[in-house]
């Protein structure tokens, strides 16, 4: 692969955005689509990476990491300034969920966690208030009925794992578990994190660092250390905040998204970075996301690292729910922790799974083609689980594979 310094006009048409990195022969269309995101889709700083059969065939980055938003003198950490670099990382929001799911799948593969067993087997207090039969599979598929909290919360409560899991252990489900999906936008991570901790003894972030990121050499963090601060870019908030403004305040959607009403700039805080928020607080770039999922794409093993057996990979595709979601205005087709092919993921291969993050980040695993794909950016769009920028890059990648 050759280093690429291809320059393409940005969305303003007045400056040029240099695209850096490498592309394997035949994947030049991905580079062109990536440059096009800056030219026509308003990208500011971003990265895209693809592995095929374990080989890194696309590893591109470009734009600027600078965002001149205000700093919080007490708790804020200035974002990195200047060009988006090879090692720039950023909060990827719900793309983090794919890492949390991977940790649970690994424990299931080792026989330590039964995804169909009641959570109360591992976490006895969780059985309270009618949750005796709620299983980990329900949390992974957003069907547990615990998409939010009864008690009013602030954004600072999101930094307190123990408080949030204690509240959920005592709370009744908002709907009959297993019957419908309702996107557990923030809550999923705390629930999975507590399950992992009860079984393994380590926090989910520590488990991930020691069992996934460390062995693979992947620069992805759930609980980002201060040593990374000089490389962390700040997200550029979307035009509209996350939430259901004007919606029925008694609706499940409003109760989920407005308690608390999370704003993107809260992720600029150092206490957010340090906290383990497994549904929304992971920091990485496209290369690290793609690398973390490369073993799964290759049947469980890549680069000498085995994360899952073939049966463990197959467990992802155990469909749990398909139909309209109670929170997102979408039809969800959910397996174990990942979305499956359907309206949200129109791809050619059936053993493909995905999830994306608020504002546009995206992770795709195609086991049939052994593809691991990721797109990560700083300028957030309106979407909650990815957007057209990542989709366009994915289409270019499949086009290259089929050429």
Which positions does each model-derived feature cover?
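Catalytic loop of the DD-peptidase/beta-lactamase superfamily, centered on the K-T-G motif
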Residues: 2-73, 87, 180, 197-215, ...
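Short alpha-helical patches at coil-to-helix transitions and adjacent helical residues
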Residues: 27, 89, 95-101, 133-136, ...
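Tryptophan-centric aromatic hotspots in well-structured domains and transmembrane helices
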Residues: 27, 61, 83-84, 98, ...
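Active-site SXXK
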Residues: 28, 34-35, 54, 90-117, ...
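Active-site helix/loop module of the DD-peptidase/beta-lactamase fold
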Residues: 81-82, 86, 91-95, 99, ...
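Generic structural signal for alpha-helix termini and adjacent loop/cap motifs
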Residues: 110, 142, 171, 295-299, ...
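Cytochrome P450 catalytic-domain "roof"
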Residues: 171-178
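Cytochrome P450
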Residues: 179-185
């Amino acid at each position: 692969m050759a280093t690429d310094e291809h320059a393409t006009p940005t969305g303003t048409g007045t400056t040029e955005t240099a695209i850096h990195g490498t592309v394997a022969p035949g994947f030049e269309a991905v580079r062109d689509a990536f440059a096009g995101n800056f030219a026509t889709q308003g990208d500011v700083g971003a990265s895209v990476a693809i592995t095929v059969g374990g080989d890194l065939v696309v590893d591109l980055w470009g734009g600027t990491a600078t965002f001149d938003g205000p700093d919080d003198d007490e708790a804020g950490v200035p974002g990195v300034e200047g060009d988006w670099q090879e090692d720039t990382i950023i909060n990827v929001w719900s793309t983090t969920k794919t890492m949390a799911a991977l940790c649970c799948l690994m424990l299931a593969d080792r026989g330590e966690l039964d995804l169909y067993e009641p959570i109360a087997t591992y976490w006895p207090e969780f059985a309270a208030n009618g949750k005796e039969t709620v299983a980990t599979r329900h949390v992974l598929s957003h069907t547990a009925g615990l998409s939010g909290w009864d008690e009013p919360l602030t954004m600072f409560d999101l930094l307190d794992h123990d408080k949030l899991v204690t509240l959920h252990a005592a709370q009744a489900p908002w709907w009959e578990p297993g019957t419908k999906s309702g996107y557990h936008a923030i809550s999923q991570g705390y629930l999975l994190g507590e399950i992992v901790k009860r079984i393994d003894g380590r926090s989910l972030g520590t488990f991930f660092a020691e069992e996934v990121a460390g062995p693979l050499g992947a620069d992805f963090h759930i609980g980002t250390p201060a040593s990374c601060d000089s490389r962390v870019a700040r997200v550029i908030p979307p035009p509209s905040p996350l939430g259901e403004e004007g919606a029925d305040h008694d609706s499940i959607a409003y109760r989920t998204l407005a308690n608390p009403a999370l704003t993107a700039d809260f992720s600029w805080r150092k206490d957010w970075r340090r906290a383990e928020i497994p549904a929304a607080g992971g920091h990485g770039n496209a290369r690290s996301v793609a690398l973390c999922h490369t073993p799964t794409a290759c049947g469980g093993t890549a680069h000498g690292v085995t994360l899952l057996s073939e049966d463990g990979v197959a467990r992802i595709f155990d469909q749990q729910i398909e139909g309209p979601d109670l929170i997102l205005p979408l039809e969800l087709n959910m397996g174990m922790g990942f979305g499956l092919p359907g309206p949200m993921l129109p791809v050619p291969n059936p053993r493909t799974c995905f999830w994306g993050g608020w504002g546009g980040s995206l992770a795709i695993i195609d086991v049939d083609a052994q593809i691991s794909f990721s797109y990560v950016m700083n300028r957030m769009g309106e979407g909650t689980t990815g957007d057209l920028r990542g989709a366009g890059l994915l289409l270019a990648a499949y086009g290259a594979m089929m050429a």
